[in-house]
């Protein structure tokens, strides 16, 4: 939850924690990102976060920017676009049509995503505009 104080939660646990793994870290708040850094710096517990850097509109998620700004290290998981180049953007499709607008987070919708390079992102957006 957005109002959860992760640092306090970890401090109140009875058992010893070896490592904290955070999936979908893009959904963390900026405050929670800094709480995780406090866990690393003051409690000496390693934290590993996994998540998307940017949304389908190429904007940072609320947690992505702060996390990338203060992370001790960043390891990118590489994916490949259909053209063979490095995929850097998660393209949203609804009913087979590339989307460049809409809500950042959609739950339970009929959307799908595909990893594409910047060139193919522009190509899909242009094709989508021509279909209108």
What are these regions, as identified by a protein language model?
Residues 15-28:
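Conserved P-loop NTPase "ATPase switch" module shared by AAA+ and STAND
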């Amino acid at each position: 939850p957005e109002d959860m104080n992760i640092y306090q939660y970890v401090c109140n646990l009875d058992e010893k924690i070896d490592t904290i793994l955070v999936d979908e870290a893009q959904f963390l708040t900026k405050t929670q990102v800094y709480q995780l850094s406090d866990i690393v710096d003051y409690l000496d517990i390693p934290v590993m976060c996994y998540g998307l850097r940017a949304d389908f509109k190429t904007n940072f998620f609320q947690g992505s920017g702060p996390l990338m700004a203060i992370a001790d290290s960043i390891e990118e998981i590489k994916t490949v676009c259909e053209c063979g180049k490095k995929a850097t953007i998660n393209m949203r499709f609804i009913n087979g049509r590339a989307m460049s607008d809409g809500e950042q987070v959609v739950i339970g919708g009929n959307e799908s995503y595909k990893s594409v390079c910047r060139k193919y992102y522009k190509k899909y957006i242009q094709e989508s505009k021509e279909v209108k």
